[in-house]
Each structure stands twice: as C-alpha cells, then as structure tokens.
Amino acid sequence: MSNTVYNEGYSGNKNLFFRKGINDTIFTQKRKFIDLGFCSGANLLGHNTDIQKKILKKYIKNNISNFSSPNIYAEELAKIIIKTLPNFSKVIFCNSGSEANIKALRICRAITKKTKVVNVVGSWHGSVDQFLFKTSKKLKVTELSNGLTPDLKKNIIFIPYNDIKSSRKILDKNRKKIACLFIEPIQGCLPNKNSKNYLKFLELYCKKYNIFLVFDEMITGVRTNLRSAQDFFKIKTDISTFGKAFGNGMPIGFIAISSKIKNLIKKKRLHIYFGGTFSGNSLTSFFAKEYLIYLIKNKKKIFNYLNKISSYFEKEINNYCQKNFIPARVYRFFSMIRLIYTSKKINNRSARDFLESLKYKEIKNFRNYILDKNIYYPNNGIIFFSYSSSLKNINYIIKTFKSGLKKFFI
C-alpha cells in the first residue's frame, strides 16, 4: 500500500518511519537505531533531552501563546543572535532554510535590479526554484525538478568549488549581470577544511565588482563552536542565512543582513516583503532563545565534547582505512562529517561524484549493512553527532564501520 504523505523520503519502507527519539537513539514501531543524522544536524543537543523538556515546560507554565504577531521573544532571540554573529545588524525570521534563501535572493535582486545569480557547484540551498538545477562536469545546466519556468535556467550561473582560476573566468564573463553569489562555505557533500583561499577570493572579487556575497550557513551555523564559518575563516559577507542548529529541532530559518544591506534598503526606500504567519513566532523564538542561552553558558563543555568525539571518529576510521588500503576517507569540519569512498584527495563534489560512481554497488551494500546493525545512516550521507552521542555508541559505530568497510571494500 502506498504512503499518504508525498514528501521526499516517504516513498520508501514504512518500517523506517520514526515515532520517537531519546538522546542519541531513535525508534520505529519495532526497532531502535543509533542516530547519525540528528534531524540533518539541527538537534545539536540530541533528542528529547532534559534541557529541551525544561524549556517547553517553562513555555507552558508561563502561559505563552504562539503569537504570529510581534512578540518580545523574537526580539530577545534576535539580540542574542546578533551577539553571536557580530558581522550583522538585523535579523529576518522565517521557518526554514529554503524560505530564508528565497528571501535573501529577493533582497539582492531588489537592491541591484539584476536577475542573475551565481551558485557554486556542490552547494545546496533547499527547495528554492532558482537553485533547483545541477551541472555536468562541463557545467551544462539541467533542471532538478519539473515545474520550473525557463527564465530560471537563464538566470543561474555555476562556478566550480575550490577552483579559483575557472571561477574567475566565469565571473569575469558575467559580472555586470550578477546580483549575488550564493555558496555553502562548507558543503555537506564534502566538508572540506581547505577552502579558506577560495572563500577569500570570492569575498574580494564580490567586493571589487559590487556583487552581493551570500553564505548559506544552515549546517555550519552554531556547529562551528557556536560561531559561523565566516567567523572561523575571517570572511565578511553581505548576507547570510541560518537555521537548523539555531533551533535545536524547532523549525527555524533566518536571514542576517549587514549594515551595508540595511542602509541600502533604507536609502533606496525599497519595500521587500518578508512576511509569513509563523515567521518569528513565539514558540520557536522562546525555545531558541532559552536554548542559545544554555549553549552560551555551557559552550566549552558542549563543543569540546562534540569536537572530541568527531575527531576520534575521523582518526579511527582514517587510520584503519590507511592501514588496510581501503579506498575511503572521512572528511570533517567540526561535528559535520562525511565518509567519502575514495582514498584520492578531492577538492570538490564533481571529483567525488565521479570516483564514487565507480563503487555504487559497494556503497549501497555498505550502507544497508550499517542499517542492519541498527545504526541510522542518513540518505544524504552527512553524519552529525550530538552532545547526547555517548562514547559507548560512538565506539560501536566505529567498530561497525570498520567491519563494513573491510567486508565491502577490501
């Protein structure tokens, strides 16, 4: 019998429909799994933790209603965010990363009066019509979805990640038509620490030619030791979008804009619509505010542990693969992790996709093996740990990964 829900992911096995989660474990009707996804990285503390329960009880006890009207909790949350992200002066709330990117793009086009947007190959910006395209190795653009209007394809330009020479050539050819450049500074498809020079190039190029630089930091915001990737790399963007771990499970997205953008909107007297019934709603705002206060107070303890277990996993798997000549390596940026199925050094998704396509059967069998051992390995391949990930379970994950790699890749 087919499933009633038509969203992505619901066409598969109903035995993998989850009903609850506790700390680092998630449950279906019949089985339990150690989680490697944590709601695509959003659940930084884990599932159904004591602090989450405490915050929700406080919300109920104080008789707070879920206002869609302006409320004090959204303002209080915004002030904490600005202290956490010092490069920005204003925050625009919404409910998801996709929505944040839609509105960030709207801001750029409203100010510049230009329509073309640059995306970096390998960056994912959610279910945004303008970004639902992919490229071939030669950067030929094709649609990822039906229902996209022809002008969208005309308005998207792709540049290769971590390739300054090729990116400069494409940008030089189109720079007068470009409103903005979107990029995930650390891509989920390849959490590469070695992108600073490329990101610095983009920052300087965009500044020189008046192209707005937009960082999509859905996966890096908060997880970068309660900072952002741009703060880590010392890059200043015009606009950045955030979500996921800023809500620890609550649906949240927001756009952070610089003083430059704020002043341009005011100077040009632009009316840019940002509304939405639940944008900045009091439930999400109150929860996120209390959660961020908790993170700030316990920053050292939480992030030291996250980095410790993430580094431990990386070293154990990589040392095992090197010692046994297994063509696989772990790539990591703080607690964002991906197992890449090649031992060759790669710098972008195009190289990764080509090399992994040669091992499609082995990868599929390996992932099914991990699932059979009661470890939930997310379909998108991005591994996130949480503060609730126990060392006992991390050791079990490492042991299982090693046995699976030996079984299918030697």
Located regions from the model:
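Conserved N-terminal phosphate-binding loop of PLP-dependent enzymes in the Aspartate aminotransferase
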Residues: 1-410
